[in-house]
Amino acid sequence: MQTRLPFFGVVRVSGEDRASFLHGQLSNDINNLAIGQACYATYNTPKGRVLANMLVVNRGEDLLLVMAQDLTEAIVKRLRMFVLRAKVVFELMPDLVVSGELADDAEPHPAAEPQLSFPAQIQENTVEIALPHTGRLKISVAENAAEYQAGAENAWNLHEIRSGYPWIC
């Protein structure tokens, strides 16, 4: 089963200070996220309230943040407030589409021990992430993305929740 996931939006983060800046803002170790790897992270208030959860993908020359589409503008606006002298550029990527793929017989797979990072295949216009719960997330331009199927999107969302990976929206 494959489907577009219109729930997600993508933000590109570039500039020579991108990893160190995000390392200081997000909950995961972005400085040590290797090229071709992805990780889950959250963006929190100083008191620890989660504002957004996301996937961070290191493509080498930039980082991609995949989060709820409804939150992308507000989170980017808030992150920009803290840039100061850091060499970081945030760019909303409306031309990129997120798709999900699950095997028809995929069972929820709650993590016994959380993975700090997981592999991401990076090709010219596509990033494919092997998620810890047996699903695959694909970030691509629209012509390379799966068609939208409401039933498949519902199955994807249910699979993520049952696997312990809900999304904040």
What are these regions (language model features)?
Residues 1-169:
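Basic, glycine/lysine-rich polyanion-binding surfaces/domains
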